[in-house]
Amino acid sequence: MSGQVTLQSSDQVNITVERAVAERSMLIKNLLEDLGESEEPVPIPNVNESVLKKVIEWCTHHKNDPQTTGEEDDNRRRTTEIDEWDQKFMQVDQEMLFEIILAANYLDIKALLDVGCKTVANMIKGKSPEEIRKTFNIQNDFTPEEEDQIRRENEWAEDR
């Protein structure tokens, strides 16, 4: 088994990485198993170069992490805690953050997807709907009447 693999981003840029790094992605791991020994670049059609490099940076840092079991995944998802390195890694602009989340989902890198989603959850935590709209530049398309109706229907969920 070769120690290196070449990935080709959606913008046709080839990036060579350690196989162990690339195999943090279940999609790439399965592709490599299906392709066998090949010198051809592995196409990653839904991820551009800058996002792929960010994902590879994360995978490189976490390449020696053990693959988690389903139960460990559940426990990890129940908390919004993020380790310090991952917090720093996720300090990117919103567009890049969402691109990383989409790439992690597409590439089937569950731990990275969790970190991205926890980052967004922490951005939302404790904010009012107005503050959330402002944070994510979301237009409010509800009429005041619709807002009142939604508040009444969800009164049970309000903090008291």
From Swiss-Prot:
Pfam families: Skp1, Skp1_POZ. Signal peptide: none annotated. GO terms for molecular function: DNA replication origin binding; ubiquitin protein ligase activity. Gene3D superfamilies: Potassium Channel Kv1.1, Chain A. Belongs to the SKP1 family. Essential component of the SCF (SKP1-CUL1-F-box protein) E3 ubiquitin ligase complexes, which mediate the ubiquitination and subsequent proteasomal degradation of target proteins. Controls sulfur metabolite repression, probably by mediating the inactivation or degradation of the metR transcription factor. PANTHER family: SKP1. This is E3 ubiquitin ligase complex SCF subunit sconC. It comes from Talaromyces stipitatus (strain ATCC 10500 / CBS 375.48 / QM 6759 / NRRL 1006).
